[in-house]
Amino acid sequence: MSEDSEVVLQLPSAPVGAGGESLPELSPETATPEPPSSAAVSPGTEEPPGDTKKKIDILLKAVGDTPIMKTKKWAVERTRTIQGLIDFIKKFLKLVASEQLFIYVNQSFAPSPDQEVGTLYECFGSDGKLVLHYCKSQAWG
């Protein structure tokens, strides 16, 4: 935590001195975009970084005759819904819009489309990731 505090103390001095109070006006040419965003977020919340990650790691595994994604591990926003994830997978696999895609958590149940990935991660995540199986036909439950 002391390292985080040191980083937070160093970051505000550069953006405020160079660009005044308007952090959004910084361009990639004058300053890197990452320090202003972390400086704007970090001082208000001082919780452990492991519990409050904005993105979580999910592991996507194909089931049955569904095409396999070459990239299996993805970082996804906690607020993304299962339906948003289904739409992303369909687009990534270039599936026809009329084709169905089912998502299963731990090979046991299909979460509702409006369920947030962050909530599933908190309940069913293990080893720092959430394992989701996807398929074009119903497999479990």
UniProtKB/Swiss-Prot annotation:
Disulfide cysteine pairs (residue numbers): none
Residue location of crosslink Glycyl lysine isopeptide (Gly-Lys) (interchain with K-? in acceptor protein): G141
Single biological process term from Gene Ontology: autophagosome assembly
Membrane protein topology class: Peripheral membrane protein
Main location: cytoplasm
Free-text description of this protein's post-translational modifications in UniProt: Acetylated by EP300.
Family: Belongs to the ATG12 family.
Record protein name field: Ubiquitin-like protein ATG12
